[in-house]
């Protein structure tokens, strides 16, 4: 078995793209299952993981596919989400502009970030042409310099965008008309390197504390480089959360981000209740000896991207033998 795992690593060198769509639904697992099935209806597209959060009312699906089919799989996901999710009745802690809120393409192997930019632009064109959902490009796929950062694109969310898109030229989409889709809103499409979504839960119900700490640790307010952060409430658990995106784990690791949040919480006499990884992460980003690791509430080996790719290749080899 060890030899099989070592040999299977060659699969990671084949052209492969990761796609990580985020959906504005976290309270109906059956909806996310239907979207996942739509993705896997494209031959060669494999769903590696899903994360469903009822407080955020948001879900993340991670799938991989060859570059020639990844856009088809992404379009099937967006199409199914458009059929199943009505943003007009959506409530949740996480900001959003669309039923499929974000659609990032990430190079895994045999493709470059520039290839993923082209895939993102192709997906955006098709989303407008086939679904009439206005499209904004961000990160490496951005067409405007002030739209590189997702928070600039998202603003205050769907309700604000619904009003502003019709009258404010600065809020016009990169592709599409000056009106959001009635039920699906808009969508932000990107190409980016690996991003790690890492949340730290605080033993407090004061949302102001989480927001203060988020401001303290995020880059845009003078905190850690390559860290985006929000303070959110977890009403079902009676906790608050510092929700972070680490856009370059080589510059700010999970451990460094955790220590910064823990120190900021300690200064406010607040204990850490736990932590979680959302979606998948590269093996190189994980430090099993770090202080955060025992506090991970949801860790399992299948959160490691390479583990899933290796297992998928072993299954493929077994079926072919």
Over which residues does each language-model region extend?
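Long, contiguous binding/interaction regions
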Residues: 14-320
